[in-house]
Regions:
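Low-complexity, Gly/Ser/Thr/Pro-rich intrinsically disordered linker/tail segments
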Residues: 286-341
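A short beta-strand micro-motif common to beta-rich folds, especially ectodomain repeats
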Residues: 91-101
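A short beta-turn/strand-edge loop motif at beta-sheet boundaries
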Residues: 52-59
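Low-complexity "stalk/linker" and mucin-like segments enriched in Ser/Thr/Pro/Ala/Gly
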Residues: 64-80
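Short S/T/G/P-enriched beta-strand
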Residues: 20-52, 105-116
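Extracellular/luminal low-complexity segments enriched in Ser/Thr/Pro
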Residues: 79-92
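...with weaker cross-activation on analogous glycine-rich loops/strands in unrelated enzymes
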Residues: 192-298
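N-terminal capping segments
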Residues: 114-230
Length: 341
């Protein structure tokens, strides 16, 4: 029995010493033989092997993207292990570093090329379009939740929200941000429940930077990025006609985040838009609409929250979103929500 215990102890000791003596191995990363399009969709897989020919364990490896925001995401996956790079929307040089407990840190650099395509010819570059169902759902959730929240903001309403266009711009921009604790504190939006963010990109890390809105007509071309075609400010007419698509004059076809658009011929500020929220983030009901009245003389205006059923029977027929009202131009949907096939 003593011999048995001694042998067992030697085995444990040998295993322990072997672990301590294990030296980091050099990792071989297959060189990329192609450029990647910075379209927010493309994927590149690079097989990984240890220099001694062994296959590394993906669970023992970590990868870090050394490039700035907007350049994509990287992970180590599979068996045999591969470095998987998922393109962002910012073109340029992307460097990734792989390391592990028993692997010497290694880096690989790839080049990503710009994506200037515009699948619909509507002026929105494809790199801004939200290709996945989950991203479109995330945008709709945040856009409507933020707009609806501001209806309850009172004195905490951001100063920039002073008319219907400003409410659209603010809610659109904030919906595309990363929604962490720092954002919630800075925007006074801590009451909103946690939800998934848009994954393809986050504002302002895209080729248009903070200039989200198209202010000139036409299909997208590369020079639009530098010639003033995109801007941070756009009035409501430009927001809707140059950044959204017509859906229907049947308001019941509106989805959460769609715009209800009017032209009031009798008013000085002729164009007006409302946001169809649908189901509320703050209470019962599934047909809520939020809008800013705009200023009237010395009155700064206010954000109102009404149900679509009430709007359809509005005392003033000019505000009823029904086909028989010539002032109602229809339901519009943001171009970034158009589905690229």
């Amino acid at each position: 029995m003593r011999t048995s215990h001694l042998a067992a102890g030697m085995v444990v000791l040998c295993i322990s010493m072997a672990c301590r003596d294990r030296r980091p191995t050099v990792l071989d990363i297959a060189s990329p033989d192609t450029q990647v399009i910075a379209d927010g969709r493309s994927t590149l897989r690079l097989p990984l092997r240890n220099a001694n020919g062994d296959e590394p364990d993906a669970r023992e490896l970590t990868v870090k993207l050394l490039s700035e925001n907007g350049h994509g995401k990287a992970s180590v996956e599979g068996s045999p292990a591969s470095l998987v790079y998922r393109a962002g929307v910012m073109p340029g040089t992307v460097t990734m570093q792989i390391s592990g407990k028993y692997v010497s840190p290694a880096t690989v650099t790839i080049a990503t090329t710009p994506d200037y395509s515009d699948s619909f010819g509507d002026g929105a570059p494809d790199f801004l379009r939200l290709d996945s169902v989950t991203d479109r759902q995330a945008f709709r959730h945040w856009f409507t939740a933020i707009a609806e929240h501001e209806a309850f903001a009172g004195s905490k309403l951001p100063a920039e929200i002073n008319d219907c266009a400003a409410l659209l711009r603010y809610s659109y921009r904030e919906a595309l941000r990363r929604h962490d604790a720092a954002w919630a504190k800075a925007a006074n939006l801590g009451e909103l429940r946690a939800a998934a963010d848009v994954a393809k990109y986050q504002y302002p890390y895209t080729p248009v930077g903070p200039r989200l809105f198209r202010v000139q007509e036409g299909s997208f071309v590369a020079r639009d990025l530098t010639d003033g075609t995109f801007a941070e400010f756009a009035d409501v007419k430009t927001l809707v006609l140059s950044n959204a698509q017509f859906i229907s004059r049947d308001v019941h076809r509106a989805l959460p985040g769609d715009l209800i658009f009017y032209r009031q011929f009798e008013q000085q500020s002729r164009f007006h838009s409302m946001i169809f929220v649908g189901s509320s983030s703050f209470g019962p009901g599934d047909d809520w609409v939020v809008y800013h009245t705009g200023p009237d003389g010395s009155w700064p205006g206010e954000i109102r929250r009404v149900q679509l059923s009430a709007l359809i029977t509005h005392p003033d027929p000019r505000w009823r979103p029904v086909p028989g009202n010539r002032n109602f131009l229809g339901v519009y949907r943001w171009n970034i929500l158009r589905e690229v096939q």
